[in-house]
From Swiss-Prot:
Protein name, per record: Large ribosomal subunit protein uL15
InterPro entries (alphabetical): Ribosomal_uL15, Ribosomal_uL15/eL18, Ribosomal_uL15/eL18_sf, Ribosomal_uL15_bac-type, Ribosomal_uL15_CS
GO term, biological process aspect, one: translation
Family: Belongs to the universal ribosomal protein uL15 family.
Described purpose of this protein according to its UniProt entry: Binds to the 23S rRNA.
């Protein structure tokens, strides 16, 4: 078997639909477009979302929500992920080096998800009330 001899399994590929190639093909003359009208013409079709003059759905529905500008600069870190780190003092740089937060992140918050049984100290990081309680119960602290 060589790369130049590879081909799809028999019957796995359908032949391309060749329209407008004679009446015997079943798709000759009008090529499956019917007679006259806008949709039979070349380039004759409405734009996406056009509903024939009726107010389109995307304009009938109200605007909703917004795009947060701070989303890419903030991050959440699970408490269970901190347990896997080899250091006892954890700050934003440590999280970036471990790949737990992205390079653009400027602030991170620890959330209560998973468990921690080792003593850790958080420096310059936020924590939810539950995460703070779990860290302090394990003998850790927030600086």
């Amino acid at each position: 078997m060589q790369l130049n001899n590879l081909k799809p399994a028999a019957g796995s590929k359908h032949a391309k639909r060749r329209v407008g190639r004679g009446i015997g093909s079943g798709l000759g003359k009008t090529a499956g477009r019917g007679h006259k009208g806008q949709k039979s013409r070349s380039g004759g079709f409405h734009k996406v979302g056009f509903e024939g003059g009726q107010m389109p759905l995307h304009r009938r529905l109200p605007k909703r929500g917004f795009t947060s500008l701070t989303k890419e600069f903030t991050a959440e870190v699970r408490l269970g992920d901190l347990a896997g780190l080899p250091v006892a003092e954890i700050d934003l740089l440590t999280l970036k080096q471990a790949g737990l937060v992205g390079e653009l992140v400027k602030s991170a918050k620890v959330i209560l998800s998973g468990s921690i049984d080792k003593k850790v100290t958080l420096k310059g990081l936020g924590a939810t009330a539950g995460a703070k309680a779990a860290i302090e119960a394990a003998g850790g602290s927030l600086a």
